[in-house]
Amino acid sequence: MNNNDLVAKLWKLCDNLRDGGVSYQNYVNELASLLFLKMCKETGQEADYLPEGYRWDDLKSRIGQEQLQFYRNLLVHLGADEKKLVQAVFQNVNTTITQPKQLTELVSSMDSLDWYNGDHGKSRDDFGDMYEGLLQKNANETKSGAGQYFTPRPLIKTIIHLLKPQPREVVQDPAAGTAGFLIEADRYVKSQTNDLDDLDGDAQDFQIKKAFVGLELVPGTRRLALMNCLLHDIEGNLDHGGAIRLGNTLGSDGENLPQADIVATNPPFGSAAGTNITRTFVHPTSNKQLCFMQHIIETLPPGGRAAAVVPDNVLFEGGKGTDIRRDLMDKCHLHTILRLPTGIFYAQGVKTNVLFFTKGTVANPNQDKNCTDDVWVYDLRTNMPSFGKRTPFTEQHLQPFETVYGEDPHGLSPRTEGEWSFNAEESEVADSEENKNADQHQATSRWRKFSREWIRTAKSDSLDISWLKDKDSIDADSLPEPDVLAAEAMGELVQALGELDALMRELGAGDEADAQRQLLEEAFGGVKA
């Protein structure tokens, strides 16, 4: 049975648990524990990780209340295991299963699945890929918690493919989530090194224990990330509890992260309640995304490269935001901006971009002034489909951007303006600074170049650069005063939100409605929605 079939069958088992009050998120947590036990059994690694008496067959051999009690004891025992990595995965883990028959059915069903593909058993990476599939399923279904800003896997794959991590390079994600960027970086290096077999023993050991470092604020999400890494044979530094550390990037934990040759990350959007900024940055600000940008600049060594997914406000916010962008373009070679389409994140309506940059310049990695000369911008947002379940965002949508980006990971491949995928030539040209003195044909393309001097003089160091006119845009001159529009919009939104809340509860999605209300409360500074 292939991995996709196994993921589908494992996810179908969730329906029975849902009837018993187990949420999707809790189901993934249960599967994480059980899948680890099963992985050790199927790959012959039980002796490496699990003490005798606390293995898959020990759990399977029991039924009913005895099995549930044994399972609870097993979680406690492994959470205090002498092996630090196992301890980190199982620490403070409790089962949410309360009915013995549910656990028996889950264990029995998992045991009866065909864990073979032809004549071959599942490898450790097979279990890892399967687990990633479950995480994506969870993100699709919940759209909240760990899944609300789940980075689309096609985007992660493109970013890593363009950054091209090499053996013995350290890759860091300071907002690790479920470790998607780190897993993809590991996958890329393995694809270039015959699954690490082309490397000597020291280099292989480096890849397993030192190459990948993440930091995650939420304990439950960190556990999912640790499990993801472990299933992909990424152990990380055991003194820090594995590849994914628990802590706050915007505090002392972030300062203690090692320097990294590559940073690939998607910091949390919005207020991110619970994330306190206790760290002293060069440009103090309450905007957490701007603080993450400063962390990336600080953590990169000369010549290090980065890709960061950021919301639009990072590109145009004034005051400290302007100072931070100037710092970025001074100390780093900001060579590429990818304007992402809306709807690709499960937090609907969020407008995002990817910034690609190198610390210093390739010619002089230690350069810390005037490192940015030209910034190339690819507009994958204007007049693109509304992505979602019906219109999924795929690798094919990113292929034209990958082509014009080029093979050089520092963005130094020969580049030419002009790329007209997705009917760009049919777009109208906006009346904007970007199109003054622009060739009409080039102005309809998705791929343009803007000089550092132009960004300074024409945009006052804003990086909110767009030149195509959205076909659904409205002429601003015909609109009422802004305060009137804002009041009308807020009134309509309040009414619509109330109706949607009632509808979701009628449809039996009360937990999802509560999650969305919590997001609203965070957005309004804790005021009850």
Curated annotation (Swiss-Prot):
Point out the signal peptide segment.
none
Supply the alphabetized keyword list: Methyltransferase, Restriction system, S-adenosyl-L-methionine, Transferase
| Source superkingdom | Bacteria
For the protein in the UniProt heading, the enzyme class is: transferase
- What one GO molecular function would you report for this record? site-specific DNA-methyltransferase (adenine-specific) activity
The record, for InterPro entries, names: D12N6_MeTrfase_N, DNA_Adenine_Mtase, DNA_methylase_A-5, DNA_methylase_N6_adenine_CS, SAM-dependent_MTases_sf, T1MK-like_N_sf
Residues at which S-adenosyl-L-methionine binds = 148-153, 178-180, 216
Which BP terms from GO are recorded?
DNA restriction-modification system; methylation
The record's Pfam families line, in alphabetical order, gives: HsdM_N, N6_Mtase
Enzyme Commission number, as recorded: 2.1.1.72
**Which residues does the annotated region (Disordered) include?**
424-443
Q: Which reactions appear under catalytic activity for this entry?
A: a 2'-deoxyadenosine in DNA + S-adenosyl-L-methionine = an N(6)-methyl-2'-deoxyadenosine in DNA + S-adenosyl-L-homocysteine + H(+)
Task: Report the function annotation for this chain.
Answer: The subtype gamma methyltransferase (M) subunit of a type I restriction enzyme. In the presence of the R subunit the complex can also act as an endonuclease, binding to the same target sequence but cutting the DNA some distance from this site. Whether the DNA is cut or modified depends on the methylation state of the target sequence. When the target site is unmodified, the DNA is cut.
Any other comment in the entry?
Answer: Type I restriction and modification enzymes are complex, multifunctional systems which require ATP, S-adenosyl methionine and Mg(2+) as cofactors and, in addition to their endonucleolytic and methylase activities, are potent DNA-dependent ATPases.
Q: Which family does it belong to?
A: Belongs to the N(4)/N(6)-methyltransferase family.
**Subunit structure comment from the entry:** The type I restriction/modification system is composed of three polypeptides R, M and S; the restriction enzyme has stoichiometry R(2)M(2)S(1) while the methyltransferase is M(2)S(1).
What name does UniProt use for this protein? Type I restriction enzyme StySPI methylase subunit
Report the source organism: Salmonella potsdam
